[in-house]
Each structure stands twice: as structure tokens, then as C-alpha cells.
Design a protein with these regions (language model features):
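Bacterial Sec-dependent N-terminal signal peptides
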Residues: 1-34
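N-proximal helix/coil linker or "cap" segments that precede and/or mark the start of modular domains
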Residues: 213-281
Length: 285
């Protein structure tokens, strides 16, 4: 029937038009104006999407040439979203697609001009300070252990109280700095800014803290593919580490670990259900 065919065709065209309209409505214009180092004059810069964090999966949206220390990008994209500007040497400079004119200073590694990019700049400065301090602390640990074999280190930790005190002090400082990374990420758990911070420092978080963060964070954070991939990587790393430790354990150590896990489970039940009665190993309440 010709009329039925025409009706189906019109419906199909209408559905296609609606789909395009819906997709287009999620897209908004962005404008980026930037300053670059003199060394980048006449060189290409690439505007990329981070994707899931894997370099091989970065999506190149556009490219431009630096002229007299300046460059620009413009277009339409779903917002907000994380993007990076990448030079020909592979150096990257993060920003967030957002309404308004985004300013980027590659020479100073700064971005701003819009609320989310201003926030990202503040957060990255904070994270960079923590990372710089961690680098200094890890360098102190390296210097303390340089030329030392594992057997010698183990012996010093048991028998050399001065060495043990120095090591414990540095380790405590390093763990506090790792905790600062976690706090920095948690402060942005309801923003796409936190997604980028998590991509930089998420693997430093203890896995238990990471699981709590995923429960507390907004869907913008917890359901982001970049975040979920990092959580899965951390989970796999934890499983590998536990398997390696278990393989190295003596039967006595395994039995002790089992008892400890059972005790931890009873404590957790007691915390959740204060009136609950838990059987002991003899079966008594």
C-alpha cells in the first residue's frame, strides 16, 4: 500500500529529526583562547577528549598551529566534559569544556575564564603541591635505602633503632601525603573536576576509601567511565597483591589471617546490629 509506505517513511524521517534535535540540544558551543611558549611557535597543538584515560583511545577533535605565541579552538561539544590540549612532544594540558571563553596558558600550565576551569586550576595547584612534596619524601626514602639489600633492610628495621625511627618518620609523612591526595579528590566528588583529579591520583587511594567514595559521590563522578575504569584497575591490583601475599604465607600465617578475618567480620556485625548475638567457635551465643 502506497499510503502506508509514505506514512512509515514520514514517521522514520520524523524520528530521525527528533533524534538529531535531542542530540544537538546536548551540544553547546565552546571557545578556547590560549598562550603558548615561544618554542611552540609554528607547531601543531591537538584538542583531544580523554576518553577512558588510555592514550591509545584519546579522541582528537581538532588541531591548530601556534602563531606568535597564541592559539585558539572553537566548536560544539556536550558539556561539561574533560579535554586535553596536547603538543607534538606529547605534553598535555587539561581543561573542561564549558560555556564561555576558556583561557589556557600553556607556558604557566594554567586554565580559567569559566567557573569549572577556575575550579580545576585551583584543584590542580593543590594536587601539584602534594605531588611535589611526595616526590621529595620518596627521594628521602630512596636515599635512606640506597645500596641496601632486602636482608640488610629487614635486619636494620629489627636491630637498628635509630634507622627504624628515621624510616618510620619518613613513612608516616609519606602516608599522610597520600591521605592528602584522597582528601583533595573527595573535596571534588560531586564535580567533573574530581573526575580529572581521580584520573591523576586515584590509584594512590586505599581501595576501601575508594569504595566509600564511590557510594558518596554524585553520579557525575561515580558513573563516569574514566572513574569506573580506574576503580576496576585498582580492584584487579588489590586481588593480585592479595594472591601474591597468600602464596608467600606459611600455613600458620594463613590460619592466623583466617582468625583475624573472622574476628573482623564479627566486629562489623556488632557495629551494624548492636543487639545481634554472634556464635563463638564453640557454637555458643
Amino acid at each position: 500500500d502506497i499510503n502506508l509506505f509514505r506514512m512509515r517513511k514520514r514517521i522514520m524521517i520524523l524520528c530521525t529529526f527528533c533524534a538529531i534535535a535531542i542530540f544537538s540540544s546536548a551540544q553547546e558551543k565552546f571557545s578556547i583562547r590560549g598562550i603558548a611558549n615561544e618554542e611552540l611557535n609554528n607547531q601543531l597543538l591537538y584538542l583531544c577528549l580523554m576518553g577512558d584515560g588510555e592514550k591509545a583511545k584519546e579522541v582528537v577533535l581538532d588541531s591548530t598551529t601556534v602563531e606568535k605565541g597564541k592559539f585558539s579552538f572553537s566548536g560544539v561539544h556536550q558539556m561539561p566534559d574533560i579535554a586535553i590540549i596536547k603538543d607534538m612532544d606529547g605534553e598535555t594540558y587539561p581543561l573542561i569544556f564549558e560555556k564561555g571563553e576558556i583561557s589556557v596558558n600553556i607556558a604557566a600550565n594554567k586554565r580559567g575564564g569559566t567557573p569549572l576551569n577556575d575550579s580545576l586550576n585551583i584543584a590542580l595547584n593543590r594536587m601539584q603541591l602534594i605531588m611535589d612534596n611526595m616526590l621529595k619524601t620518596s627521594d628521602s626514602i630512596y636515599k635512606l635505602m640506597t645500596g641496601m639489600k632486602s636482608e640488610e633492610f629487614a635486619d636494620k628495621m629489627v636491630n637498628d633503632t635509630a634507622f627504624r625511627a628515621r624510616y618510620d618518620k619518613i613513612e608516616k609523612k609519606f602516608l599522610a601525603q597520600m591521605d592528602s591526595v584522597s582528601h583533595c579528590i573527595k573535596d571534588y566528588k560531586n564535580s567533573i573536576v574530581g573526575v580529572y583529579l581521580f584520573s591523576v591520583g586515584g590509584m594512590m587511594m586505599p581501595f576501601d576509601d575508594m569504595k566509600i567514595l564511590m557510594k558518596e559521590a554524585s553520579p557525575m563522578f561515580s558513573q563516569n567511565n574514566l572513574v569506573r575504569n580506574i576503580v576496576e584497575k585498582k580492584n584487579q591490583a588489590e586481588l593480585r597483591m592479595k594472591a601474591e601475599l597468600k602464596n608467600k604465607m606459611t600455613p600458620e600465617q594463613r590460619e592466623e589471617q583466617k582468625k583475624r578475618q573472622e574476628m573482623d567480620a564479627k566486629i562489623k556485625i556488632g557495629e551494624r546490629l548492636p543487639d545481634a548475638k554472634v556464635k563463638d567457635n564453640a557454637g555458643n551465643m
